[in-house]
Amino acid sequence: MAMTDSLDNALLALLAEHRLPGLSFAVIGGGQITCARGYGFADPARQVPVTADTLFQAASISKCLTALAALRLVDPGRLTLDEDVNERLRSWKIPASEFIQSERVTLRRLLSHQAGINVHGFAGYATGQPLPTLIQVLNGTLPANNSAIRVNAIPGTQPRYSGGGYTVLQQLLMDVTGQPFGDLMQEIVLQPLGLTASAFAQLLPVSLEKLAATGHDKNGQPIPGGAHSYPEMAAAGLWTTPSDLAKFALGIQDALAGQPGAILTPALAREMLTVQAGVYGLGPSITGHGLARKWFHSGRNAGFDALLLTEVETGQGVAIMTNANVNSQVINEILQAIGAMTG
């Protein structure tokens, strides 16, 4: 009880200090979720509290789940890591350019931010704004609010973070399977891992919408236009909870350990968590060496910040989600407070 009280006090103090409306976290240890809690308000105006069941936007952590979907299609041979993705794209093609004359955009390079593709991230669309199709996003045509997604560096020559690359991947997955992206993710990632409080959706189903937090800016003010929609779902479109992110991490760790019925083969799980270039694996980023090696991804959408961090060798980890934009130091303070109390 004393430990719980101390953690509560520490996190509530951080909420007050940094004008955070709310936060939620889940801790992983011993192959299970050992703790999941919520603090503050999901919607301060209506005094709706954050609980362990509150949904937040995962933002760029979406990329890790998208990467898992792609690797699940590699296993049966529907995709391969090192072929030219233009061979599989049907609805849209990567335009010819001087940059892809000798090197190609491959799935491996898309997953590890080595494809030479522009557009770091996406601003999203406030309630009432017209939503572009994915093709309009790829071409940078109205009502899309991003530049055209193009190769503007030779693939394989430099790691450069690219939400645009994951948007190409979204189109690739849809073309290869013939399924809407949200349905595909439900079928081959969310449902198999038991992520029942998660959805890749621009409009949440009613059962989940009522649990969704309201996003806020760095000053704790509600985001104008409400939670933004992200048609670039592969890069930024996941709504979820820390507990569901923890289940995802457990699924990857089970695959790494070769557990029966795991979501991936051990070989693909190892490849996913192996640095390809810079800090990037196939989806997650990797830091540290040996027993200290960790895989992680952070996320920021308008009004939401998040972090998923897992130790490769021990499987210990944590997922943190907030309904306000804060700097990375605040997330680190939250991480340290949780780590100090939970080990």
Q: Which role does the model predict for each range below?
A:
Residues M1-G38, D53, F122, T127-L131, ...:
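Catalytic loop of the DD-peptidase/beta-lactamase superfamily, centered on the K-T-G motif
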Residues D8, Q57-I61, L73-A123, Q171, ...:
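Active-site helix/loop module of the DD-peptidase/beta-lactamase fold
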Residues N9, A13-A26, R46-R109, R150-G164, ...:
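Short active-site loop at a secondary-structure junction
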Residues R37-R46, L138-N145, G215-I223:
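Acidic-glycine-rich active-site phosphate/pyrophosphate-binding loop
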Residues T66-A67, G165-Q170, A246-K247:
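Well-ordered alpha-helical segments within folded domains of soluble proteins
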Residues L110-L111, V137-L138, N146, M272:
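A generic structural signal for nonpolar/aromatic side chains embedded in well-ordered alpha-helices
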Residues I117, P159, G215-H216, T240:
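Fold-level recognition of mixed alpha/beta catalytic cores in primary-metabolism enzymes, strongest
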Residues T127-Q136, P143-A153, T157-Y161, V168-Q179, ...:
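Recognition helices and adjacent regulatory flanks at domain boundaries
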